Amino acid sequence: MEAPPVTVMPVTGGTINMMEYLLQGSVLDQSLESLLHRLRGLCDNMEPESFADHELVYLLKGQQGNPFILRARRSLLDPSVPWHLRYLGQPEVGDKSRHALVRNCVDVAASHSLPDFLNEMGFRMDHEFVAKGQVFRKGVMKVVVSKLSRVLVPGNTDNTEPLSLSYLVELSVLAPAGQDTVSEDMRSFAEQLKPLVHLEKIDPKRLM
């Protein structure tokens, strides 16, 4: 089967149950430095956070319908920090007035035995990848620029291969339900990143 669409959010702490507002795009490797320079000028006056994470995507197939998907992620830079378990709900794409994709997001810290727990619960690891990049912040908005690599040997994060010749760029906000005005702020910020990157409201179902 084709892998579910990737969404990259580094292990930097999580909120229990919020709505995620999301815009996505990509930038070619040769244009990366120009984008990073633009982000340094537009975002808060602080150094971006570097991250290198290993994510495992688990599926639990039910009697009918789509499988239940959970994402387990750990930091490769600091193995002592907790794992993170993430659930992303179905996107609410029907409202054309929203400038961003909106979906429920549940994010909790977990112990290092998380993979064993998921296996015991009947989940099957579908695929894994490594994400390396930087996180910029602009108020409540977060911009993640990351290079995604496939893991060639299961569990061996030292043996990877880039998925593409580009970087994934994600602009997101975590907020309580009903805070749709943040999508207008996101749209305005995304306009300032053109033409280096075009951030869009992407329906994951179109990519399946």
Curated annotation (Swiss-Prot):
- Tell me a GO cellular component: mediator complex
| Entry's Gene Ontology molecular function annotations | transcription coregulator activity
Question: Which keywords describe this protein according to UniProt?
Answer: Activator, Nucleus, Transcription, Transcription regulation
Supply the InterPro entries for this chain: Mediator_Med18
Per UniProt, subcellular location reads as:
Nucleus
Keyword Transport in record: no
Q: Which PANTHER family match?
A: MEDIATOR OF RNA POLYMERASE II TRANSCRIPTION SUBUNIT 18, MEDIATOR OF RNA POLYMERASE II TRANSCRIPTION, SUBUNIT 18
Q: What exactly does this protein do?
A: Component of the Mediator complex, a coactivator involved in the regulated transcription of nearly all RNA polymerase II-dependent genes. Mediator functions as a bridge to convey information from gene-specific regulatory proteins to the basal RNA polymerase II transcription machinery. Mediator is recruited to promoters by direct interactions with regulatory proteins and serves as a scaffold for the assembly of a functional preinitiation complex with RNA polymerase II and the general transcription factors.
Quaternary state and interactors = Component of the Mediator complex.
Q: What is this protein called?
A: Mediator of RNA polymerase II transcription subunit 18
Q: Gene name, please? A: med18
